[in-house]
Amino acid sequence: MSVAECERPHEEEYVQVRGSDVYFYCEVCETTVLELIMKLRKLEKELLHKYLDLDLHMRPEIRIWIRSDGGDIHSGLSAMDAIASMKRVKVRTIADGMCASAATFILLGGRTRHMTENSYILIHQLNMDGSWGKFQDYKDQMENLEQFMRRFREIYVQETKIPDDKLKKILRRDVCMNSDKCIDYGIVDSVWI
């Protein structure tokens, strides 16, 4: 997970909506997460109006399909918060292929979480791209990174069944987890069929 901005042009759309399905098949960055949040809010509003017009007495469902190698951690956390705040609709998140790094926070935002049978999930510690500065800048940066890591551990412990001691070991490595392990750890609820 890094704190870098997208390297892709801003004119392109990377988040697609098809019916009640939202496809996030891209890098996690300010641009793509803003696009995701805006499209989710619009879809939520459309579905609520549709269900009201049809006099359906149930909560609409939105499925977010995630295929991402990760990206900017702050954007991932922003997406997680936005998804979790959508209380008027049921939001399912589904890892499809690879859901790594900052993208796992998008996954954790879902009310129910799933992954396709041949998908993998990767969680790991923060990494820092090249930086320059004075000695005190490095000390400040290290303090900030330690604070972020504590918060990440809190989120994973709160949102999954991974014990803190096991989580510390997982975060030190870059090891992909299959569906069996992700279900055992409570990262996802089930395999999506």
Locations of the language-model features?
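Terminal-region recognition feature
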Residues: 1-193
